[in-house]
Amino acid sequence: MNFSGKYQVQSQENFEAFMKAVGLPDELIQKGKDIKGTSEIVQNGKHFKLTITTGSKVVQNEFTLGEECEMETLTGEKVKTVVQLEGDNKLVTTFKGIKSVTELNGDIITSTMTLGDIVFKRISKRI
């Protein structure tokens, strides 16, 4: 399955609790909670380029499935991780105690990030 496309956030659950748990300042949490950000994914075989735009903040990450890479997190921190493909429609990675699963079903991408007992879920639709 090819993940390439541009997606806009439709809904999210537990944004504030998750962002507080990862150390984002309250001011940025309040600014970001109502923004319907976009994600653009360009997939070329096992190589992915991901651009996430939330208001004026843009985060770009590139990775190749199964290879260690450096990624920028939501808080701006750089972490080393490995992204794996599960089945043909799930991208899975773990960093700093956070498990991130991005699942594509048709035109809907569901991103789930779990830290301890806090589960942040974001649903985006292809635009």
From Swiss-Prot:
Domain of life: Eukaryota
Modified residues (N6-succinyllysine): 31, 36, 46, 57, 78, 90, 121
N-acetylmethionine, modified sites: 1
Residue numbers bearing the Phosphothreonine modification: 51
GO-annotated biological processes: fatty acid transport
InterPro entries (UniProt xref): Calycin, Fatty_acid-bd, ILBP
Gene Ontology cellular component list: cytosol; nucleus
Keywords: Acetylation, Cytoplasm, Lipid-binding, Phosphoprotein, Transport
Compartments in which it is found: Cytoplasm
Modification sites for Phosphoserine: 11, 39, 56, 100
Transmembrane segments annotated in the record for this chain: none
Any matching Pfam family: Lipocalin_7
GO terms for MF: fatty acid binding
Family: Belongs to the calycin superfamily. Fatty-acid binding protein (FABP) family.
Oligomer status and interactors: Monomer.
PANTHER family: FATTY ACID BINDING PROTEIN
Domain notes: Forms a beta-barrel structure that accommodates hydrophobic ligands in its interior.
Primary role: Plays a role in lipoprotein-mediated cholesterol uptake in hepatocytes. Binds cholesterol. Binds free fatty acids and their coenzyme A derivatives, bilirubin, and some other small molecules in the cytoplasm. May be involved in intracellular lipid transport.
Protein name: Fatty acid-binding protein, liver
